[in-house]
Amino acid sequence: MMCYDNSEMLSRQIDVMANDKPLMLTSPKQRQGGYFEQLACEFLQEQGLILIAKNWQRPKVGELDLVMLEKGQAWSTLVFIEVRQRNRSHFGDAALSVTAGKQRKIIKVARYFLHQHQKYSDYECRFDVIAYNTSNNKNSENETDIRLDNQLNQPLEKDQPEWLQGAFIASAW
């Protein structure tokens, strides 16, 4: 299942290099981030959310990983989603990596998004986090766990996303 944008195109324009080819995610970290954002988008669409924007940017301010719409019977909620992935370690899990500073940045970019897309300005808003805590342990140096793509640190089947709904709030919204 692919993560499709079901509404008007709100995502940022793709920068074009001199040879008219779009810039590709080239670093391993960028590819890994894109992979987990795609997984999160597909997971949330399976839960009934509708994709509004993916990787929406406000230059010199920040980026929103996913902006989705959750339709309710009484009202709809615009959901700003931060996707995080971290290998399990003693430094804490993926959800803990969304610091107060990162939260402020996401809120600031969300304000710009709402200002630019005023048709959503009356919607209830929520800030969620999708966290992937992956495993990259090997049994030995010579053995490879075939369930794990070492380049992308793909989650094992038992590693499901942790969906933190309303993970943080925007005061004085």
Swiss-Prot record:
Tree of life domain: Bacteria
A Pfam cross-reference name: UPF0102
Disulfide bonds, paired cysteine numbers: none
Any one GO molecular-function label of the UniProt entry: nucleic acid binding
Coiled coil: none
Transmembrane region(s): none
Gene3D superfamilies: 3.40.1350.10
PANTHER family assigned: UPF0102 PROTEIN YRAN
NCBIfam families linked: PRK12497.1-3, PRK14687.1, YraN family protein
Entry similarity comment: Belongs to the UPF0102 family.
This protein's name: UPF0102 protein Psyc_1908
Protein's organism: Psychrobacter arcticus (strain DSM 17307 / VKM B-2377 / 273-4)
